[in-house]
């Protein structure tokens, strides 16, 4: 889908003259060692010529308060080594000065540094929060502005789009760009916050399918989000070293279209590359085969990150405890993956809040058997709870509830006859006591509107059922994916 989408970013900044490369780039607010850095500042300067530039200045407090200034109403002009910007419209008597060649208190020139200072005339500044953009901003030399006017973040021989500009409606991502001193970089893709301050992003093209659009990058844009056109991810499991993953084969299985995919586990998202296929091989086994990973019938992917990052991504989990997703670029680019905690065996089980249980019980009119907290966002703004009811008329019933604040935002109920044989695609897989238990949350994805898609794996001794719950209004829509047979012994 990404190759077919034409998406855009605000950026027709024109060609950048070589003389302006001396100061074009990204600058970060500096703090002394004895200062408490509870906020950050970033200044982006994109040259339009030797004496004009577009700029973006952001100051963000850790609590969320933000100042954003930019040159929406026209570029700033260099005069006597300073860019001076005045708040547009006349509503505020406010001036921002960006001095390119500042000196220390002792008169020593400060290289790769810009001094930002604000001047408030009569009245108050345009913001009413306890922040100020004042300070010294030091250049991050890993960022550069290419002749096409885009800002890139370099790493080795490659670079990724870091800021596509802010004031036009289209960006065409090139295959290569010329950086400082004439060095040619291969453009690897787009960073996740490259469009964070865009206003009318409507059209962008990428040069080739090997370029990657980072997680959440398109959530900032005006590109239409259509769940029905996004390629669904696949459930997968890892080898013992957790650097290779396989999507087990099932009837009707079609391998992902692109060789480059992303592996998702909890909030971790890492690039991967196609590395094997055993579909149709005589000795291949369909299901989860932990004892003989390479005999799994399916499609294999290898992570493209260092071992240290793999260890961090799966810290606290052995391979046999992991189910993950293999996802195409369009799914990853249109969703964010917030950090969350989940229940993990053998941790102590936590009951869901009593007020939530009461809300769910009233909604469904059943007597509660037990409740469980399944997973909760670390920012405190979202929680998945599970409530199982007493059996009624030989029927078992469990409800998943997505909680925001103190209220039930969306629910999904699952029922089954307790005396029936469970279908192969059933997500119940009840334990010996006839209860549902707690499924493993593989990841929680958020779409551009903030709705969640929760991917779960329900483990039992002989199989794993993979499904998802997608928030649609006040309902969690259940999406069945696959059920794996778990091989215990291999003859």
Language-model features, listed with the residues they occupy:
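Surface-exposed loop/turn elements that mediate protein-protein interactions on large endomembrane-trafficking
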Residues: 346-362, 402-430, 469-477
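Structural signature of tandem-repeat unit edges
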Residues: 144, 149, 166-189, 198-214, ...
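Structural signature of eukaryotic scaffold interfaces centered on beta-propeller domains
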Residues: 369-381, 440-448
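N-terminal leader/presequence regions that precede the main folded/catalytic core
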Residues: 222-339
């Amino acid at each position: 889908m990404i190759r077919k989408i034409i998406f855009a970013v605000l950026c027709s900044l024109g060609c950048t003259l070589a003389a302006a490369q001396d100061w074009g780039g990204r600058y970060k607010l500096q703090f002394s060692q004895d200062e408490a850095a509870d906020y950050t500042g970033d200044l982006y300067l994109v040259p339009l010529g030797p004496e004009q530039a577009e700029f973006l200045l952001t100051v963000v407090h850790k609590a969320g308060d933000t100042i954003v200034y930019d040159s929406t109403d026209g570029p700033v002009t260099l005069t006597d080594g300073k860019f001076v910007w005045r708040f547009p419209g006349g509503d505020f008597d406010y001036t921002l000065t960006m001095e390119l060649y500042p000196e220390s208190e002792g008169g020593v020139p400060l290289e790769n540094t810009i001094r930002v200072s604000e001047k408030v005339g009569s009245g108050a500044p345009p913001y009413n929060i306890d922040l100020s953009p004042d300070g010294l901003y030091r250049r991050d030399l890993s960022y550069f502005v290419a002749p096409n006017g885009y800002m890139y973040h370099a790493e080795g021989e490659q670079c990724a789009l870091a800021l596509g500009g802010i004031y036009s409606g289209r960006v065409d991502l090139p295959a290569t760009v010329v950086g400082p001193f004439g060095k040619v970089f291969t453009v690897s893709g787009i960073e996740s916050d490259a469009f964070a301050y865009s206003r009318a992003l409507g059209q962008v093209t990428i040069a080739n399918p090997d370029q990657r659009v980072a997680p959440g990058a398109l959530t900032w844009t005006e590109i239409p989000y259509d769940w029905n056109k996004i390629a669904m991810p696949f459930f997968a499991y890892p080898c013992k070293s957790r650097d290779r993953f396989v999507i087990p084969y099932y009837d009707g299985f079609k391998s992902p279209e692109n060789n480059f995919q992303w592996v998702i586990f909890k909030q971790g998202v890492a690039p991967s590359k196609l590395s094997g296929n055993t579909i149709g091989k005589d000795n291949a086994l369909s299901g989860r085969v932990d004892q003989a990973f390479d005999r799994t019938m399916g499609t294999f992917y290898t992570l493209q990150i260092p071992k240290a990052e793999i260890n961090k991504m799966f810290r606290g989990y052995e391979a046999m405890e992991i189910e993950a997703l293999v996802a195409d670029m369009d799914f990853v680019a249109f969703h964010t993956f917030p950090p969350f905690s989940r229940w993990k065996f053998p941790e102590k089980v936590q009951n869901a809040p009593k007020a939530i249980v009461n809300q769910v019980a009233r909604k469904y009119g059943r007597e509660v058997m037990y409740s469980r907290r399944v997973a909760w966002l670390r920012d405190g703004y979202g929680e998945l709870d599970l409530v199982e009811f007493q059996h009624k008329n030989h029927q078992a019933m469990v409800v998943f509830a997505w909680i925001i604040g103190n209220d039930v935002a969306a629910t999904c109920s699952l029922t089954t006859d307790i005396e029936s044989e469970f279908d192969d695609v059933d997500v119940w897989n009840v334990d010996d006591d006839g209860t549902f238990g707690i499924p493993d949350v593989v990841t929680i994805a958020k779409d551009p509107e903030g709705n969640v898609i929760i991917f779960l794996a329900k483990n039992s001794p002989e199989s794993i059922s993979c499904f998802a719950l997608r928030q649609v209004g006040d309902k969690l829509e259940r999406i069945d994916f696959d059920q794996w047979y778990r091989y215990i012994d291999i003859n």
